[in-house]
């Protein structure tokens, strides 16, 4: 099964840029989170349908996004579906389509009542795999 790439375009705001005139490092996490939420909505439904918590997030910054950029593009791929976790690989692109950052994150399915992780259900797994690489553990 091939990977499905979910793409979202996000508008930048004046406050997203720092005093050095580039997109602030912390804002990347916000953009990546919005893009992951979009990918999950398109596979398993909204957050209420698939409560989750982020247990890992890493970003490698490759290229500056300078003040004046009106939007960025975030591409998200579901790289792996585990027993209770989903691994995402994401890239943030400059307005010119160059890779500005690469990210990997792991989300864990969450049971709000028990306040703990839970096993990903069969229907959820099928939906995630349909939007992902097909790699299961």
Residue ranges and their predicted role:
Residues 1-73, 79-137:
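Terminal targeting signals and extreme-terminal segments of soluble enzymes
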């Amino acid at each position: 099964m091939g990977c499905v790439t979910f793409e979202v375009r996000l508008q930048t705001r004046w406050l997203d840029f720092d005093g050095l005139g580039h997109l602030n490092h912390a804002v990347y996490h916000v953009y990546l989170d919005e893009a992951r939420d979009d990918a999950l909505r398109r596979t398993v439904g909204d957050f209420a349908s698939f409560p989750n918590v982020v247990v890992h997030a890493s970003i490698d910054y490759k290229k500056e996004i300078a003040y004046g950029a009106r939007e960025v593009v975030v591409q998200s791929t579901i790289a792996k579906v585990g027993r209770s976790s989903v691994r995402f690989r994401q890239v943030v692109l400059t307005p010119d389509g160059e890779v500005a950052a690469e990210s990997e994150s792991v989300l864990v399915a969450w049971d709000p009542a028990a306040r703990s992780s839970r096993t990903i259900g069969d229907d959820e797994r099928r939906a995630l795999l349909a939007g992902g690489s097909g790699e299961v553990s």
